[in-house]
Amino acid sequence: MENASILIVDDEKAIVDMIKRVLEKEGYRNILDAASAEEAIPVVKANKVDLIVLDVMMGGMSGFEACTLIREYSDAPIFFLTARSSDADKLSGFAVGADDYITKPFNPLELAARIRAHLKRTYQSKETSSNQTYTYDYFTFSPQNAELIVGGEAVACSAQLLQLLQYFCEHPNVVLSKDQIYEKVWGYPSYGDNNTVMVHIRKLREKIERDPSNPEYIVTVRGLGYRFIPNPEGKRS
């Protein structure tokens, strides 16, 4: 995990240097940095980046715009770093493809812990992925190959959404709370952060459901959480 490539994108050099120092103390050696979103795009194109820490408010292209472009080349987890902390801002960030949201001012040790937890979860998911392919009426999912086929066509999906889908597939017909999903998929306590789970489930529904507004596979259990139904309405794969 210490061999992971981490890209830090922020126009404040002091913040970049602080994050790099903390990550280096944690044992990470492959740390890249960029001073702008425009500078970050070619770095992502030229390197296999495992995780990106991306500032939202920078001169020129914003982090939101950069995230959308990065998603064309990479499914690496993206942690937004920003002073904008409203729920609306967080929802906007998750909507464009972010995986986590760190509010300034922040504790660099907490950021390092979140990065480690996320990378650990990603590597564990890859190591434990079996050869099993989950085949349902409308989509097929291969965790080992990170491949999602919906309606006969390959669908691009971020690593975080694939981990979320894998967790649901591994727990069919079980009611899962938002806190439970967050802790298992993101790798650390949710502290009541339900928006993260809700937005990612909405995005996952947009990928796998025939009608995301009337989901068949990932259904809401009011007051409790969500249930994954592998064969809606008695359908058999």
Swiss-Prot record:
Gene symbol of the encoding locus: yvrH
Modified positions (4-aspartylphosphate) in chain numbering: D55
Compartment(s) of residence: Cytoplasm
Keywords: Activator, Cytoplasm, DNA-binding, Phosphoprotein, Repressor, Transcription, Transcription regulation, Two-component regulatory system
Stated role: Member of the two-component regulatory system YvrG/YvrH that positively regulates 7 transcriptional units (wprA, wapA-yxxG, dltABCDE, sunA, sunT-bdbA-yolJ-bdbB, sigO-rsoA, and sigX-rsiX), and negatively regulates the lytABC operon.
Upper classification of the organism: Bacteria, Bacillati, Bacillota, Bacilli, Bacillales
Keyword Repressor carried by entry: yes
TM helices/strands, residue ranges: none
Database matches in InterPro entries: CheY-like_superfamily, OmpR/PhoB-type_DNA-bd, Sig_transdc_resp-reg_C-effctor, Sig_transdc_resp-reg_receiver, WalR-like, WH-like_DNA-bd_sf
Source organism of the structure: Bacillus subtilis (strain 168)
Molecular function (Gene Ontology), one example: transcription cis-regulatory region binding
Superkingdom, taxonomy of origin: Bacteria
PROSITE patterns: OMPR_PHOB, RESPONSE_REGULATORY
Residue ranges for the DNA-binding region feature of this UniProt entry: 131-230
Response regulatory domain location: 5-119
CDD domains in the record: REC_OmpR, trans_reg_C
Protein name: Transcriptional regulatory protein YvrH
Record's comment on post-translational modification: Phosphorylated by YvrG.
